[in-house]
Every structure is written in structure tokens, then in C-alpha cells.
Amino acid sequence: MSVSVRESTLYRGAYLAVSLAVLFLDQWTKGLVTRTMEVHQSKTIISDVFDLTYVRNTGAAFGLFASVDSSIKAIMLNSIAVIVFLIVSAYALRSSHKSVRLQVGLALILGGAVGNLLDRVRFGYVVDFLDFAVSGHHWPAFNVADSAICIGVALLFLDMLGSEEVPAAGPTPAPGG
């Protein structure tokens, strides 16, 4: 499929806009939490289902690697985030002609990875605050960046399952001719 320079620029602009929107929303919500709540403070939104709970996550998404030595963990997690940033950016730039689902997925992953990396570099931890429990099972607190990364990965998976080829808009031929 051939893509014009203009179309490629539009794809890249949209990709950048989605990534920056995720980054802004992530950092804005984390800022609200850190300014209005104390660490480990909870505010119930939906009883027995959803709380806002301020957690300082020194591990990875959903608390993974929380027990790893802090000096090794910082290097490991920051390195992973930088590698993800480089791979996702390079792939997105090379595949701007691919599906919208792929581009949105990559943009969500990039925005989320950068959001959590900023926290880790600035604070040494990631601010988590979305706290869900379902049928008595508690899920580790997470944030907007984690959500964007998970949705982005799901979109990449869906993109691998099938193409979303959309025919180009154009004049519809008249019936019978």
C-alpha cells in the first residue's frame, strides 16, 4: 500500500498527539493524587469495588519486582523503559502506513512507558492510585500509564490477529455500469 508524505505526516502527528495526551493525563492525575492525598490514604468511590488509594510503587506494573534490590531494580526498570521507548518509536516511525489500531496501540504504550519512566526518574517510584476489588479479590493499584500500556498491548494483539484494511473512499460506481 502506497502512502503519501502527507498521509504519513498525519499518521505520525496523530501518533504523537495520542502519546502526549496519555502522558499529560497520566502526569496530571498523579499530580492531583500527590497534592490532595497522603501516602496509603484511600477515598472510596464505589463501595467494595473502587477506591482511589495513593501508593508509591517501587516495582513495575501492578507491583511486579517490588522485592528486588532497589539499586538493581532502578537500573533494570529504567533500562527496560528506555528500550521500550526506542523500540516502539522506531517501529511506529517505520510502520506509519499500517493500521490505525497498530498506531494507536503503539502510541498508548509509548505514552504510558514515558509517564511511568518520568515518575521513576524523578521520584524513584511510580505513583499508583486506581484501586479495584471484584468479588473480594483485590487488584494491585495502578495508574493511567499502566492502563494505557495494557490497552495498547491488547490493540497490538488484535492487530496481529487480523488486518483492518479499510477501502479508500472514492466515488461509488453506478449500478450496472
Tell me what each language-model feature is.
Residues M1-G177:
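Alpha-helical transmembrane bundles and membrane-interface segments of multipass inner-membrane proteins
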